[in-house]
């Protein structure tokens, strides 16, 4: 590898400060265009599903190429062979990272959630920037470890929370910091509707199926305990319905819908979480799946001039309450409409937003938005045109990206605290926000860490 290039790009990780400000601090440069910097060479771990989508978003920027790619499902690699013929192809990413060391400037991790942590730990050996799919990991302890390793090794990182690069994110923060709406009181967020994507029949877990042709099932399982293949896991991504691989609707979407509110209000970790399910979800009977009509209640402590704050999450078949300020002539049925979004109730007004990055942010009803528009605060925080180009330019310019693990990890952990509450329906779990341990139900702490194989724990347990 060319030494100058190595020093210019890959060596840039050493120039990144260890501390990264939560809630979207300004970066050194915001997507400078027209630069003549070297293209970033990506080592791609996972090329199907979101991997296919995000890698194409990287390529469309014109700032990168794929130098090598690994996927455990052979058909996922066909497009790479055709569109990036220079890329070396692998099934096992560990072999790829080792054999191609020095031939890539950044790593993308777009695997199922249960493999994020070990893939990052492996990539961290090579001290190159890392882009990782959301949620950042599969458990709280994995997430904390990834944040710590990135911080200690000064690795440039970005989480695929693309909403953080959309204009609604800084806009909501500016609105709330202005004080024009008064103090925030509570948020109500809804997601997924009657979505079978998160509602697989529990009995499928006891009906083993044959893995599809081209899938290396052993490699796909990565660090977790071995089980027979369940139909539908690959290639359509139905693994999110199963607790050993994914985190259901809340784990999948929390960064998109908790992130904007947490950023705008500068929320610390919740100190209590409660889950109830209208359909009588019993985790003892169905320990591998998730509730189909859940409501989560996150309690955040008072901070500064803001009092205690309650964040409500409704998913799948659970209807969110109609906001009192919503236009009376418009229908509001979060299940029938399959909406993803939410509303933030403040002392003076109610704000409504969409599925990612507080998209479509507005005051409700429309008449209030029209009246208050002339009084809205000016822009204060940077806007980003492209989440993927932002990461690549951060690599080129040797600076932090706008959604590092320090930020994306906090959003991930907030959602995962709800995941733990899922296993204790109707019980209020209290948490120590410093130790990140449950203080009133000791058995909940057994769910903080991963259920790895002995081999995985021997290899990567030192990171936890």
Task: Walk through the language-model features, giving the residues of each.
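N-terminal secretory signal peptides and thylakoid transit peptides that target proteins
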Residues: 1-16
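A contiguous active-site-proximal alpha/beta segment in oxidoreductase catalytic domains
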Residues: 129-131, 137-214
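Non-transmembrane alpha-helical segments in soluble domains
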Residues: 9, 55, 81, 94-97, ...
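Conserved acidic residues
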Residues: 67, 105, 185
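Beta-loop-alpha module in the N-terminal Rossmann-like domain of NAD(P)-dependent dehydrogenases
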Residues: 48, 87-145
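Contiguous beta-strand/loop segments that form the cofactor/metal-binding neighborhood of enzyme cores
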Residues: 171, 183, 188-194, 198-406, ...
């Amino acid at each position: 590898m060319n030494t100058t290039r190595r020093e210019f790009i890959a060596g840039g990780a050493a120039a990144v400060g260890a501390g990264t400000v939560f809630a979207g601090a300004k970066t050194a440069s915001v997507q400078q265009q027209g630069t003549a910097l070297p293209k970033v060479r990506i080592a791609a771990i996972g090329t199907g599903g979101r991997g296919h989508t995000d890698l194409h978003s990287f390529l469309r920027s014109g700032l990168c190429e794929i130098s090598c790619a690994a996927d455990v499902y052979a058909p996922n690699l066909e497009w790479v062979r055709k569109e990036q013929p220079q890329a070396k192809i692998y099934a096992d990413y560990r072999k790829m990272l080792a054999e191609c060391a020095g031939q890539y400037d950044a790593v993308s991790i777009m695997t199922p959630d249960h493999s994020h942590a070990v893939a990052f730990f492996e990539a961290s050996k090579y001290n190159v920037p890392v882009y990782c799919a959301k949620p950042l990991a599969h458990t709280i302890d994995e997430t904390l470890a990834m944040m710590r390793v990135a911080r200690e090794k000064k690795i440039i990182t970005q989480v695929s929370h693309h909403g953080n690069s959309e204009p609604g994110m800084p806009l909501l923060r500016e609105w709330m910091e202005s004080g024009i709406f008064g103090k925030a009181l509570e948020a109500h967020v809804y997601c997924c509707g009657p979505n079978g994507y998160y509602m697989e029949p529990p009995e499928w877990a006891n009906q083993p199926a044959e893995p599809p042709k081209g899938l290396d099932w052993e490699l796909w399982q990565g660090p977790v305990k071995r089980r027979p293949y369940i139909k539908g896991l690959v290639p359509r991504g139905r693994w999110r319905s199963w607790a050993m691989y994914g985190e259901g609707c809340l784990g999948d979407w929390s960064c998109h819908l908790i992130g904007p509110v947490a950023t705008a209000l500068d929320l610390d970790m919740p100190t209590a979480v409660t889950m109830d399910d209208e359909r009588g979800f019993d985790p003892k009977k169905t320990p591998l799946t998730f509730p189909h009509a859940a409501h989560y209640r996150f309690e955040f402590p008072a901070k500064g001039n803001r009092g205690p704050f309650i964040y409500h999450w409704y998913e799948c078949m659970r209807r969110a309450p109609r906001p009192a300020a919503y236009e009376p002539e418009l229908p509001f049925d979060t299940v029938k409409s399959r909406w993803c979004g939410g509303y933030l109730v403040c002392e003076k007004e109610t704000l409504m937003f969409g599925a990612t990055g507080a998209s479509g942010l507005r005051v409700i009803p429309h008449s209030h938005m029209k009246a208050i528009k002339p009084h809205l605060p000016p822009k204060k925080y940077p806007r980003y045109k492209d989440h993927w180009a932002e990461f690549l330019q951060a690599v080129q310019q040797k600076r932090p990206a706008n959604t590092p693990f320090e930020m994306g990890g906090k959003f991930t952990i907030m959602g995962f605290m709800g995941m733990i509450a899922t296993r204790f329906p109707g019980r209020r779990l209290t948490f120590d926000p410093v130790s990140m341990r449950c203080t009133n139900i000791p058995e909940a702490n057994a769910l903080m860490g991963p259920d790895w194989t002995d081999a995985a724990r021997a290899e990567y347990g030192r990171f936890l």
